[in-house]
Amino acid sequence: MDDIIVAQKIVGNTYSNISNKAIFHEYSSVYKSSNEMLSKINKYTKEKKDILTVTASGDQILNFICNGTINIDTFDISRFASYFLFLKLAAIKNLTKDEYIEFFFEAIFTYDEKYDDMYYTLRKDLNKKAKDFWDSLFDYFDWYDIYNSYLFSSDEKSIGFIEKENIYLKEKNYNKLKDMIDKVNINIYNSDIFTLEELYKNKYDLIYLSNIINYVDKIKYRKLLSKFNLKENGTILTYFFDINENIKKLFLEENYKFYSFKDTTAKVMQYKNK
């Protein structure tokens, strides 16, 4: 089915995108915000010009841009993720930080026409495909209904957590980001991690794979890392909310390093070419 038709049916509760076979699939729900402690990985992502990353909520991409990234290849198995990323990018260019937070993280609590007004303020900076997608929803539904549908994941974080973990939401960075967005080249790929062969030839300063490892075969994932083409001092980061020793035993070579963070079980694995 067409993306727009599927999205309308999901919001209108006439189609279910909840699958017993796979958590993540072509029309799986999108995260409203990252549930990862992105502030912990910030030091590993500074001044990385060329990046490959999962799309997800788009938050890490906005952080990367703040840190100097100019070329971004981004992939997600869900076809909805890229539409949401472009919505956030357009919103940043047109809304104040407080309006942005209200639109994306407070709209879940209330019906209000002001959210429609915010959308029609930002829509001029959407590309045609994203504009057609979001117009098709706002023409028939309130933002409250859209944002509380299964188009989005119910896994939500507090506004306090979101502001703390995302450097792009610091007032100074947010205002700088408004001018930086148009200088960034973003390429979208609707793909899972194992079907990115066309990108193996590209050279990256950083590849961010979030916690994808938790949902795939670990041996297959390990083999995949060596297929990517990293620049000198380039790295691949894998995020863990927690990790057991059996998984760590799969990554004992010297080009794998694990880093822990204070006051959390979260860890990051850094991979570098030998």
Placement of each model-derived feature along the sequence:
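Conserved beta-strand signature within the Rossmann-like core of class I S-adenosyl-L-methionine
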Residues: Y208, E232-N244
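A short glycine-rich, Lys/Arg-flanked "PGG" loop and its adjoining helix->strand segment in the class I
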Residues: K220-T235
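C-terminal region signature
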Residues: I41-N42, D242-K274
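S-adenosyl-L-methionine
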Residues: M1-E47
